[in-house]
Amino acid sequence: MNDLKFKNLLIIFFIFSSPIHANEFWGLEAWMNSIRTPNFDQIKNIKTRKEAFFAYLLPEIKRQNSKIIELRNDIKSGRLDASTLSALKKYYRLNTQTTNTELLDTIDIVPASLILAQAAYESNWGRSRFAKYYHNFFGLWCFKKGCGVVPLRRSKDSTHEIVKFSSLSKGIEYYLLSINRNSAYDILRKIRKHKRDNQQPITGTGLAEGLENYAQIGYDYVETVQAIIRHNKLGQYDYRI
């Protein structure tokens, strides 16, 4: 098998093995990974806790963004065959007539500062039940009965559950997928495209403007995430991919 064919098969495997669905295999692997997760509750010093939190998440954020960059390079180079490109378009919920240029507008990185800030806010700096036991640092929901974990304070009229993941890697991967294909974040992707087209830096504070639909508090959420980025000087990580 030549390298080009292997590359296409590898991407197809990646698509079908990724956590597209919330109800993935979850058991011994999840338990083992939970043991390896730092106990942020026990770190009483706020500065130390934040440092531990960023140190835990940042390597995986860099790894996942690097995978996206590699995929973008494969698309640009023309190394992917028609069936692989078709599978990618389906995976990202795009029309089959989508051009490679349009595909690249969807498949792109998310700044590390934005990921870290959202994870900090959504998981209470890694101390939430969903972060500790289910590797969900981003408050990601699913809506099919049994797809995840039922929140303790869910209202009677609500049907959502919290997505559970077997590892931090799968949690971040799914978060990036959500940002890149969910219609709720179309504005974020347009901001990112504008930055790309004009050769401007892709920053967390800039892309946060497209997160008004991420939480029920609307634009207050945008301002909160931007404040976390600025206060913790997270912009320093945006160019370390």
Q: Model-found features: residue ranges?
A:
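Sec-dependent signal peptide recognition
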Residues: K5-I12
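Catalytic cores of secreted/periplasmic lytic hydrolases that degrade extracellular macromolecules
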Residues: H21-A117, Y121, W125-I241
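Short, Lys/Arg-rich N-terminal segment immediately upstream of the first membrane anchor
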Residues: M1-L4, Q42
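N-terminal signal peptide c-region/cleavage motif recognized by signal peptidases
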Residues: S17-P19
